[in-house]
C-alpha cells in the first residue's frame, strides 16, 4: 500500500498488522532424509528465540510436507521463495517451468503457514547491478531474450497464477522496491549487506532501515567443541590452516585479492573488541561480535516500527559443519547471536538510543493488548554504584513502539567518563520484570573494564555467578 514515503510492506493477520521477527532458513543437511530429522529442532530453535517467520530461501529446496506441517502447528509463518537464486533463466523452458510451478503450488497451497510466495532471490539485483551481461557476454539480442524470459516467468506466469494471486501474496524478486525496481529504503524489501560485504559499521542498520529487511548478517565461528568434531587436532590450528580455509566460502575479491570471511570477521572484531590472541579468543569474539550486530539490527528495525515492519536475519541454520552466518551450528548448538536474538525478539522489550544529544528510552510492545507498568532506569558505575536513577509509570500501548524518556546526555554524564558508566534498564508489571537491558556509551573495547573476581555456585540445575565488578559477555561451556 502506498504512503507518503513510498509503499509499505506489511503482513496483516486477522486485520492486525504484525511485525515480523525471524530468520532465513536453508536445508539443515545436504541429504534430504537426514535433513527431515532436524525439522523439529530448527523450528523449536525459532520458537524459543521468539520468531514468527522463516524464509525458505530460493537457493535451497521445496521442503518436505513435515516441515510445512510443523510450521502450521507451531504458528511459524513462511516466506516461500521459488527455487531461483542469483541466476537468470535460459529461454525455451517456460513450459517445463510452468509444470514445475503448478506441481509446487498445488502441493503447498494447502498450508496456511505460507504467508507470501516470492519469485526469486537476488536475480533482479544480479542482472541490474552485478554486471552479469558483461560477465556472461550477454549483449544485444541475447541480453534482450534473457531479460524477456525473466519478465515472462516472474512478472507474468507466476504473478497471474490464480493459485497464488487469489489466495496469497506474491512478490517477484527479493530484494526489490516493486516490479523490476531495485531495492531502496522507501518501498518493498531490502537485503542489507552494507554490513559485511560493504564493511560498514553496525549503525548502518539504523541509518538504512527500510520497510522490510529480509536479509542481513555477519559470520561467526562455531564453538570449539563443534570444530573438534570435524577436526580433533584443532588445538594446534590457526585460521590459515587448509582445513578451516576449506570451510570458509565467503570470498570478497573486490575488496582485495584473497580477501575472505576470516578477514572480515577479523575486521569487525577489531572495530568493536580487543584484538584476540589465539584461536579460542577468535571463536569467542566472533560470536560476541555477531551477537552485537544482530541485536543492533533487530532493535533498530523494531524501533523504526511502523515504517519498518519486518526483520529476517541471515541465517538460522547450517547445511554442514562450517563457518557461516548461522546463529545455530550444524550440530544444534546455539551461538551467542541466537541468545541475543531471543532477547531482541521478545514481544515486549526496553531499549535505548542516543540521538540528537539525548538518550531515548523505548518500550516496544508487539502484543495485541496494552500493558501497564513501570520503567526503572539507573546510571551505574562498572562496580555497581548507582549515580542517578529515573522511574516512570507507563502504559505500553497495543502493537506500538513508544519513547517514554528523553534524557539530555549532558545531564547523564556530569563529569563522568563515558567509558566507566552504563545504563541499566528494566520494565516491570505487577512487580515482575518483563524485560531488562543495558546500554553502553562506548564500543565494548573502550569500556574501562576491571579484572573481575567471579564466584560460581551451583544449586541443583542452576548456576549462579557473582562478580565484584561488571563482567561482560560471560560464556559458560562444558565438555559434556
Report each predicted region and the residues it spans.
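Active-site-adjacent substrate/metal-binding segments within catalytic domains
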Residues: 1-116, 252-288, 465
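Secreted/periplasmic carbohydrate-active enzymes, especially glycoside hydrolases
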Residues: 1-54, 303-304, 308, 333, ...
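Residues that line or immediately flank small-molecule/substrate-binding pockets and catalytic motifs
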Residues: 25-27, 58, 121, 174, ...
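Flexible loop/turn segments at secondary-structure boundaries
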Residues: 27-30, 61-64, 86-88, 123-127, ...
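A general structural detector for well-ordered alpha-helical segments in enzyme core domains, enriched
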Residues: 42-45, 67, 97-100, 104, ...
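Active-site-proximal structural scaffolding
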Residues: 64, 97, 110, 151, ...
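Active-site neighborhood of glycoside hydrolase catalytic domains
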Residues: 73, 90-181, 289
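Substrate-binding clefts and catalytic carboxylate motifs of secreted carbohydrate-active enzymes
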Residues: 117, 124, 160-187, 191-371
Amino acid at each position: 500500500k502506498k504512503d507518503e514515503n513510498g509503499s509499505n510492506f506489511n503482513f496483516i493477520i486477522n486485520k492486525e498488522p504484525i511485525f515480523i521477527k525471524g530468520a532465513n532458513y536453508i536445508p539443515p543437511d545436504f541429504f534430504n532424509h537426514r535433513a527431515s530429522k532436524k525439522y523439529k529442532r530448527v523450528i523449536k530453535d525459532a520458537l524459543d528465540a521468539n520468531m514468527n517467520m522463516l524464509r525458505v530461501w530460493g537457493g535451497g529446496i521445496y521442503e518436505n510436507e513435515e516441515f510445512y506441517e510443523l510450521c502450521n502447528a507451531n504458528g511459524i509463518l513462511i516466506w516461500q521463495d521459488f527455487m531461483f537464486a542469483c541466476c537468470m533463466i535460459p529461454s525455451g523452458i517456460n513450459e517445463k517451468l510452468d509444470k514445475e510451478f503448478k506441481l509446487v503450488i498445488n502441493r503447498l497451497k494447502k498450508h496456511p503457514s505460507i504467508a507470501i510466495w516470492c519469485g526469486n532471490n537476488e536475480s533482479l539485483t544480479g542482472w541490474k547491478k552485478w554486471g552479469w551481461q558483461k560477465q556472461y557476454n550477454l549483449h544485444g539480442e541475447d541480453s534482450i531474450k534473457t531479460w524477456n524470459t525473466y519478465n515472462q516467468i516472474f512478472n507474468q506466469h507466476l504473478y497471474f497464477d490464480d493459485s497464488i494471486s487469489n489466495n496469497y501474496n506474491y512478490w517477484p524478486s527479493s530484494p526489490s522496491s516493486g516490479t523490476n525496481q531495485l531495492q531502496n529504503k522507501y518501498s518493498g524489501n531490502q537485503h542489507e549487506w552494507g554490513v559485511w560485504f560493504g564493511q560498514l559499521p553496525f549503525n548502518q542498520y539504523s541509518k538504512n532501515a527500510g520497510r522490510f529487511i529480509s536479509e542481513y548478517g555477519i559470520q561467526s565461528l562455531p564453538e570449539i567443541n563443534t570444530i573438534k568434531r570435524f577436526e580433533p587436532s584443532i588445538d594446534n590450528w590457526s585460521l590459515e590452516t587448509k582445513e578451516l580455509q576449506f570451510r570458509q566460502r565467503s570470498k570478497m575479491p573486490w575488496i582485495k585479492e584473497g580477501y575472505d570471511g576470516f578477514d572480515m570477521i577479523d575486521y569487525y572484531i577489531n572495530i568493536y573488541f580487543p584484538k584476540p590472541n589465539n584461536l579460542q579468543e577468535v571463536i569467542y569474539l566472533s560470536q560476541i561480535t555477531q551477537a552485537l550486530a544482530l541485536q543492533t539490527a533487530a532493535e533498530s528495525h523494531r524501533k523504526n516500527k511502523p515504517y519498518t515492519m519486518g526483520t529476517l536475519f541471515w541465517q538460522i541454520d547450517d547445511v554442514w559443519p562450517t563457518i557461516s552466518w548461522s546463529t545455530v551450528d550444524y550440530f544444534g548448538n546455539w551461538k551467542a547471536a541466537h541468545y541475543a536474538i531471543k532477547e531482541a525478539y521478545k514481544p515486549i522489550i526496553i531499549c535505548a538510543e542516543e540521538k540528537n544529544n539525548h538518550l531515548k528510552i523505548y518500550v516496544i510492545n508487539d502484543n495485541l493488548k496494552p500493558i501497564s507498568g513501570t520503567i526503572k532506569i539507573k546510571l551505574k558505575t562498572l562496580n555497581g554504584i548507582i549515580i542517578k536513577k529515573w522511574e516512570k509509570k507507563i502504559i505500553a500501548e497495543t502493537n506500538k513502539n513508544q519513547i517514554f524518556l528523553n534524557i539530555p546526555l549532558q545531564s547523564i554524564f556530569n563529569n563522568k567518563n563515558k567509558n566507566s558508566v552504563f545504563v541499566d534498564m528494566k520494565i516491570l508489571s505487577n512487580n515482575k520484570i518483563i524485560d531488562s537491558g543495558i546500554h553502553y556509551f562506548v564500543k565494548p573495547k573502550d569500556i574501562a573494564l576491571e579484572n573481575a573476581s567471579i564466584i560460581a555456585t551451583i544449586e541443583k540445575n542452576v548456576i549462579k555467578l557473582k562478580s565484584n565488578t561488571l563482567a561482560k559477555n560471560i560464556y559458560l561451556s562444558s565438555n559434556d
